[in-house]
Regions:
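Intrinsically disordered, low-complexity regulatory segments in eukaryotic proteins
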Residues: 110-130
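Charged, amphipathic alpha-helical regulatory modules used
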Residues: 1-116
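C-terminal or otherwise distal, non-catalytic regulatory regions appended to signaling enzyme catalytic cores
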Residues: 125-141
């Protein structure tokens, strides 16, 4: 499930304040929200366990959309500058939260794969095995 979809479900069930709680990570893991982009898990953990999640929740309820979006943009920059997360992952996490909270329909979530980062491929059981033709080629035959 996409991160923003999982966030919407969790927020619908537990309210927007769940963004600032450690248990958010367990809920998102249950929905397999990190399967496509495992690195986003660390970005979300930083947001949920720090003051950033609290501030996003506060601004979502007490501020204008413009103020929220200004903070969201500065948060993305902070995550990259201070925590050394890749810009694409910081953008994906913060934009997914913004969309899920319902602050603004103007938010567009761009997946990291749209910037050249491929989603993680699932193990199909064939990983690590080579065909007979490949084995023969490798052995010079």
């Amino acid at each position: 499930m996409k991160l923003q979809e999982a966030l919407r479900k969790v927020i619908r069930q537990f309210g927007g304040s769940v963004i600032q709680e450690k248990r958010l990570m367990s809920f998102l893991a249950d929905y397999k929200a990190f399967d496509d982009y495992p690195a986003v898990k660390e970005v979300m953990r930083a947001i949920a366990t720090g003051d950033w999640g609290k501030e996003l929740c506060r601004l979502a309820t007490d501020a204008s959309d413009a103020d929220y979006l200004r903070y969201a943009e500065s948060l993305k920059e902070t995550l990259v500058r201070e925590r050394n997360f890749k810009q694409e992952f910081a953008d994906y996490a913060v934009d997914s939260i913004s969309l899920a909270i319902g602050v603004s329909s103007q938010v567009t979530v761009t997946e990291p794969g749209d910037h050249g980062y491929e989603a993680v491929r699932k193990n199909t059981g064939e990983q690590g095995s080579r065909s007979a033709q490949e084995k023969g080629s490798a052995q010079g035959g």
